[in-house]
Amino acid sequence: MSRLREKYEKEVVPALMERFGYKNIMQVPKLEKVVINIGVGEAKENPKALEAAMNDLMMISGQKPVITRAKKSISNFKIRKGMPIGVKVTLRRERMYEFLDKLFNIALPRVRDFKGVSPNSFDGRGNYALGVREQLIFPEIDYDKIDKVRGMDIIIVTTAKTDEEAKALLELLGMPFAK
């Protein structure tokens, strides 16, 4: 069992039950999944870029990403429906806990001028979205092997009903929120 999952079961659950007055352990919010998405805008001119993004994401997440395709054609962006425009991966269970542990304790502190993540990025339903500007903050990515600095979106989906509950959950798990 991963470190973060153990922390959740031993420390976070009792703390949340006390703070929000849950009667049943099943009411306590928990992490459902983490979705990591890399939008590859240059995929239409450069098919190799999609492959490179896939490899980066595979190394970061430890899981094979799936290619996302355009839902509809947009002439301004010169994309047609069905064209590959990015890669994403959905992590659940152990892999999710391991990824978040790595994100909170290793990757985020490596961001330049890092003062904490914004506490305003919740969506109103207890999910958190985080944008990362470069994939280099992850220890698995070798600086010499990347073709281009790529950002990514990390969405943390929880079972919390409100943003307040979700923030408490993530804070107790060790998410470094800005003060």
UniProtKB/Swiss-Prot annotation:
Lyase recorded as keyword: no
Any one cellular-component term (Gene Ontology): ribosome
One MF term in the entry's GO annotations: rRNA binding
Pfam annotation, one family: Ribosomal_L5
Keywords assigned by UniProt, alphabetized: Ribonucleoprotein, Ribosomal protein, RNA-binding, rRNA-binding, tRNA-binding
Example GO biological process: translation
SUPFAM superfamilies: RL5-like (SSF55282)
Subunit relationships: Part of the 50S ribosomal subunit; part of the 5S rRNA/L5/L18/L25 subcomplex. Contacts the 5S rRNA and the P site tRNA. Forms a bridge to the 30S subunit in the 70S ribosome.
Stored HAMAP family: Ribosomal_uL5_B
General function of this protein: This is one of the proteins that bind and probably mediate the attachment of the 5S RNA into the large ribosomal subunit, where it forms part of the central protuberance. In the 70S ribosome it contacts protein S13 of the 30S subunit (bridge B1b), connecting the 2 subunits; this bridge is implicated in subunit movement. Contacts the P site tRNA; the 5S rRNA and some of its associated proteins might help stabilize positioning of ribosome-bound tRNAs.
UniProt family annotation: Belongs to the universal ribosomal protein uL5 family.
Annotated protein name in UniProt: Large ribosomal subunit protein uL5
Organism: Caldanaerobacter subterraneus subsp. tengcongensis (strain DSM 15242 / JCM 11007 / NBRC 100824 / MB4)
